[in-house]
């Protein structure tokens, strides 16, 4: 869960043109806070992206700082980087829940983000 948290934070920080510090030291200590903040980051990032025009989106960069070294990458790297990685790990969580007898409620519509 912490890894998905940091991935969602990276996506959100990118929408603010904010630096992503590695390693991330600002991580909540309990499951509920991690889950809640992860969902909030994704919701806020979605809203921020929908307010951008194509030129603003094109100019946006993902920025990282690690040990004093700064690196930046095109916004498109969010797709094959943090977003793809978060989807992959979410699938792992779903699989683990099934194998331990705790599957996700079948009335959940993942595509719509709602219950049927």
Could you describe each region identified by the protein language model?
Residues 1-24, 65-116:
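Short, contiguous alpha-helical
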Residues 29-66, 70-95:
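Acidic/histidine-rich alpha-helical segments that form the ligand environment
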